[in-house]
Swiss-Prot record:
PROSITE patterns: SSB. Homotetramer. HAMAP family: SSB. The keyword tRNA processing does not apply. Gene3D superfamilies: Nucleic acid-binding proteins. This is Single-stranded DNA-binding protein. GO terms for molecular function: single-stranded DNA binding. It comes from Borreliella burgdorferi (strain ATCC 35210 / DSM 4680 / CIP 102532 / B31) (Borrelia burgdorferi). GO terms for cellular component: nucleoid. Keywords: DNA-binding. The keyword Chaperone does not apply. InterPro entries: NA-bd_OB-fold, Primosome_PriB/ssb, ssDNA-bd. Coiled coil: none annotated.
């Protein structure tokens, strides 16, 4: 039986996304998210930032690159992928965990959101990016204030 490897995470991009291609031509989009873990200490709420590296592949990577900019608020869902390697310069063993993104939701600067999921990938292959953005549902953000728990 396979174990469960699934997560949902929200945060803001720490830098613009970076699009690259593998030797076989597959698009790879990389970006990082800052996520604040909020804890109460001495009757005061304190944010503890955490940083996560994310990866998106294929057509979705190409279509999202222009939209994922520093400061953009997103919610991602996907799975964790552990990677390890040996540093070429020092010989030290290195490792990190990436989030392989299956679904992504972008929050616009207003109170609307744009959602893109696996089902959207097929429509992206036959349309210009401008046409696809027009067809995406806009959803009101009813939770613009902090949740008190």
């Amino acid at each position: 039986m396979a174990d469960i490897n699934s997560l949902v995470l929200s945060g803001r991009l720490t830098r613009d996304s970076e699009l690259s291609y593998t030797e076989s031509g597959m698009a790879v989009l990389r970006f990082s998210i800052a996520n604040n873990r909020r804890m109460k200490k001495n009757d005061e709420w304190i944010d503890y930032p955490q940083y996560f590296d994310c990866v998106i592949f294929s057509k979705r990577a190409e279509s999202l690159n222009d939209y994922l900019k520093k400061g953009k608020q997103v919610v991602v869902s996907g799975s964790l992928k552990y990677e390890s390697w040996q540093d070429r310069n020092t010989g030290d063993k290195r490792s990190k965990v990436n989030i392989f993104v299956d679904n992504l939701q972008m929050f616009s600067s207003g109170s609307n959101t744009i959602q893109m999921q696996d089902s959207d990938v097929n429509s992206l292959t036959n349309h210009k990016k401008e046409d696809v953005v027009k067809d995406i549902d806009i959803v009101d953000d009813k939770f613009s204030e902090d949740i008190p728990f």
